[in-house]
Design a protein with these regions (language model features):
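Catalytic cores of glycan-processing enzymes that make or break glycosidic bonds
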Residues: 1-203
C-alpha cells in the first residue's frame, strides 16, 4: 500500500507522510532481519483531518479504469511495521500505531531502557514520543537479553508476548475501522485484501 518517497505525492504532500520512516515487515522464518521496503509510512492523523481526501481521490481515479482492486499488505490499514530511516534492518522497527510502554513503567518493572543507537537492545524508543518504548522484535536473541537474570527474563518474556500478541488487538481493529469503511464507500469497486506473516487475531 506504499508510495515511493520520490513520488509526486510525497513531493506535493509531504505532510501526509512520515518521511523519516520506512515501511517494512517484522522478521519471520523467511527473513530473519525482517523487510525494509523503503516507502515512507502514512501520517494517518494528518490524512484524517480532511476525511482521507488523498485516498478518496486515488480511489475515484482508479474507479475510472477498474471494477475491482486488490490491497496488498492490507495489514497496513491496521498497523504498519515502521523502521527509522537511519536503519536498514527490520529488527529496529516497531508497529505504528502502537501502545508503547512508558519509561516509568519499564523502570518500575526493573528495566532501564536507553536509546544507545545500538541494535543489541531490549527496547527501541518511539520516534515521536520521548521516553516511550517498544520491545525490540526478536530481542531474545540479543546479548542484552542473555545477560538478564532469570527472573527478569521471565518478566521481559511476559511483557514481550503481551505486546506483540495481545495488547493491540482491539486497538488495531479500531484503527482500521476508522479508515477502511470510509475509503471503500468512495466507489463501487470490489475490494480484495491480502496479507501474510504476523497477522493479529483482530484482522
Amino acid at each position: 500500500i506504499g508510495v515511493s518517497r520520490q513520488s509526486v505525492d510525497a513531493w506535493q504532500h509531504p505532510d501526509l507522510f512520515h518521511l523519516d520512516s520506512q515501511a517494512g515487515a517484522p522478521p519471520d522464518a523467511f527473513a530473519v532481519d525482517g523487510q525494509n521496503w523503503g516507502f515512507p509510512t502514512y501520517n494517518w492523523e494528518k490524512m484524517a483531518e480532511d476525511g482521507f481526501g488523498w485516498w478518496k481521490a486515488r480511489m475515484r481515479k482508479m474507479a475510472e479504469y477498474f471494477d475491482a482492486f486488490r490491497i496488498d499488505h492490507i495489514l497496513g490499514f491496521f498497523r504498519i511495521w515502521e523502521i527509522p530511516v537511519p536503519y536498514k534492518s527490520g529488527l529496529m522497527g516497531h508497529f505504528n500505531p502502537a501502545l508503547p510502554y512508558s519509561g516509568e513503567e519499564l523502570r518500575n518493572r526493573g528495566f532501564n531502557p536507553e536509546n544507545t543507537g545500538d541494535t543489541d537492545v531490549l527496547f527501541v524508543e518511539d520516534p515521536r514520543k520521548k521516553d516511550w518504548w517498544h520491545p525490540r522484535i526478536s530481542s531474545q536473541n540479543t546479548r542484552a537479553y542473555a545477560q538478564l537474570p532469570d527472573w527478569l527474563k521471565n518478566s521481559y518474556n511476559d511483557l514481550y508476548n503481551d505486546f506483540f500478541y495481545y495488547r493491540h488487538n482491539a486497538f488495531w481493529k479500531e484503527s482500521a475501522y476508522r479508515k477502511l469503511p470510509a475509503l471503500l464507500r468512495t466507489t463501487g469497486m470490489l475490494c480484495c485484501g491480502e496479507d501474510l506473516g504476523m497477522i493479529p487475531a483482530s484482522v
